[in-house]
Amino acid sequence: MELGYHYPSKYGDEQHLPMIVMNGLLGGFAHSKLFTNVRENAGLAYTISSELDLFSGFLRMYAGINRENRNQARKMMNNQLLDLKKGYFTEFELNQTKEMIRWSLLLSQDNQSSLIERAYQNALFGKSSADFKSWIAKLEQIDKDAICRVANNVKLQAIYFMEGIE
């Protein structure tokens, strides 16, 4: 099952970093709400995650589920986003997510495809993303209110469910 959402943030604007953190809290890491609540606690999915495309304004939640869990899983997935909109997450979860993003950024500095992608983005947008200290300082400033603001701009656009024939 896939749930597709639109949000008005674009690459490089002031909502860029809060959206990255919000996605991390939602489904970007193993400690995320989708993974912890839908997969681990409720056992409704064998795989679950969310992905963010900062260039198109598209957020995707996806889950591998059994068809009989379809409605319950969809409702529970939506509830994880609603929890973020209402600020139902802890400072520990927020800090853990920011730490994971920091480590991902540091690891990307030693990855050829990440370096090529970053050079392409710099050429395309005329901006330099190489100032990691500044980027991390901005990341540290993101708080619960910033997450709630960006989460409240996320709107459901499409639901896709594919099932086989028995």
Describe each region flagged by the PLM:
Residues S49-S108:
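M16/insulysin-pitrilysin zinc metalloprotease superfamily fold
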Residues L3, I20-M22, V38, M61, ...:
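Buried hydrophobic packing residues in well-ordered domains
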Residues Y5-Y7, A63-R67, E163-G164:
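Short beta-strand-to-loop capping motifs
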Residues M1-E2, E14-P18, L54-L59, K75-N78, ...:
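Short acidic (Asp/Glu) and glycine-rich catalytic loops that position anionic groups and cofactors
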Residues N41-I48, D143-A146:
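Short amphipathic beta-strand starts and helix->beta connectors
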Residues T97-E166:
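C-terminal regions of mature proteins
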Residues Y11-G12, G24, G28, A63, ...:
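Hydrophobic alpha-helical scaffolding
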Residues M1-K33, A42:
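His/Glu-based metal-binding/catalytic segments typifying zinc-dependent metallopeptidases
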